């Protein structure tokens, strides 16, 4: 079963803040309706009460958006992800157990197509507000492997170590000068060297660990490192809005990998 309750307090805080943000949004929407027509059964008997409820909900919602972030430092690296992003402020971890060998699962990670990942196209459609655009992770063609789409639209392969770990990374934010003059080759070393203000990098991995005969624990973790306070504040608000959808996509991706790996097939 896929899980999001990995990685300790920072991840649980991300879940809590996102839940609170959307809850306050619902309260604000209901209070706004009560400003037009009071809703006595919800305690909003007058427009004055509705206005107070709306203002409180808006204030609390803003509070969740600007809540301070927690920085995590990896003390003892155990994965390629740990080496590439040893310091980060935002993360999410999901895992599943698959009845197949690591070799078989690893081969399938980047062959799972967009159409095989439930809700992916729906959530990316919502994220881009229904606007059309070129093929990308926000507008993925259904018949292509999602990894292929990512690597052709701003993501980079940072580590490919079968059958143990695959790492992809992208630039969430970068100064104009850096975007105009990118390095000729972007590797894990490029990401590890980023410390100048104005950057935010997102790196995700798929890590496999055998836990028995033809039984594997597959984990995916995403980390975001923002290099300065301004970028951290901006990304914190964005992260708390997109976190639920991001988590669903990763859980559905794991589920698609699991389903594909456990299908009857020629032995590895």
Feature locations, PLM:
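Hydrophobic-ligand binding "helix-grip"
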Residues: 16-19, 45-54, 64-70, 151-214
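Beta-strand/loop substructures that line and gate deep hydrophobic ligand-binding cavities in soluble
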Residues: 74, 187-245, 257
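Transmembrane alpha-helical segments that serve as helix-helix packing and pore/cofactor-lining elements
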Residues: 39-44
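Hydrophobic ligand-binding cavity/cleft-lining segments
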Residues: 55, 61-158
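A conserved amphipathic terminal alpha-helix motif
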Residues: 30, 234-268
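Membrane-embedded alpha-helical segments of integral membrane proteins
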Residues: 8-38
